Curated annotation (Swiss-Prot):
One of its GO terms (cellular component) is ribosome. Keywords: Ribonucleoprotein, Ribosomal protein. InterPro entries: Bacterial_rp_bL28 (IPR050096), Ribosomal_bL28 (IPR026569), Ribosomal_bL28/bL31-like_sf (IPR034704), Ribosomal_bL28_bact-type (IPR001383), Ribosomal_bL28_sf (IPR037147). GO terms for biological process: translation. Belongs to the bacterial ribosomal protein bL28 family. GO terms for molecular function: structural constituent of ribosome. Coiled coil: none annotated. It holds the Pfam family Ribosomal_L28. It comes from Nitratidesulfovibrio vulgaris (strain ATCC 29579 / DSM 644 / CCUG 34227 / NCIMB 8303 / VKM B-1760 / Hildenborough). This is Large ribosomal subunit protein bL28. Signal peptide: none annotated. The gene is rpmB.
Length: 69
């Protein structure tokens, strides 16, 4: 799916590098994406690529890891 958040759809934006002499060249601002395991409401666990804003806001439910006794 490329560099795009699977929850909010955030993707790269275009901007400029600006030098001291004010010469502008194109650059890309990439979102901070992380691959995390997400537990779906059905109980299934799936790996998704999400931005850190969605992680912090609680939009992704991490699966419960059980310790073996």
């Amino acid at each position: 799916m490329g560099k795009q958040c699977e929850v909010c759809g955030k993707k790269p934006q275009v901007g400029h590098h600006v030098s001291h002499s004010n010469i502008k060249t194109k650059r890309r601002f990439e979102p901070n994406l992380q691959s995390v395991r997400h537990q779906l409401p059905s109980g299934e666990v799936k790996t998704v690529t999400v931005c850190t804003r969605c992680l912090r806001s609680g939009a992704v439910t991490k699966p419960v890891v059980r310790k073996s006794a």
